[in-house]
Amino acid sequence: IEKDCNFAIEDEKEMVLIGYLAFLDPPKPSAAEAIEQLYAHGVAVKILSGDNDVVVKAIARQVGIDTSHFLTGIEIENMDETALKEAVKDTTLFSKLTPLQKTQIISLLQEQGNTVGFLGDGINDAGALRQSDIGISVDSAVDIAKESADIILLEKDLMVLEDGVLEGRKTFGNINK
C-alpha cells in the first residue's frame, strides 16, 4: 500500500459518516476504596489531567473526589503566581493541563510544605513524576514514565497506595525514635 500524503479539498467530497469511535479508560475497580482509605489517613487527593473537564469530573465522581473546586489549564494560564498559589490549596480537580502546568502545580504544593506523590503513566506525566517527592507509575506505563518514577506498581490494585502510606509512616516514626 502506497502512502499518499497529498490531499486536496477535492478529495473531501461524497464522503459518508459511518460511525464514531470512542475510547474509555475507566478507573480501576479499587480506585474509590483506595481514595476513601487515603482520605481516612489524612491524605489529600487531587486529579491533575490533560483530559477535558467533562471527563475529569466524571472520573472524580466515580471515585469519590469532590468536584466543586475545579481549574482548567486555560484558567491557570490567566492567573498570576499569587492567585495560583492560593488556588492550588483547595482545588481538587485540574483539567486540560500541559505537562509544564502539572509540574508547576506540584512545585507550588511543595512550596506550601506538602509532600507530594504523583501517579502517572504517560509521556506528559514525566516532568510531574520527576518533580514530585514520590513519583509513582505502573508496569504498563510508557518507558519515560517508568524511568521518571521512584516506584512502579506491579499490582493492578490501588489499595497498595494505602499500604505504602502506612509503611512509610511507620518507617519515618522508627527513624525518628
Predicted region positions:
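Mg2+-dependent phosphoryl-transfer enzymes with acidic/Ser/Thr/Gly-rich catalytic loops
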Residues: 122-177
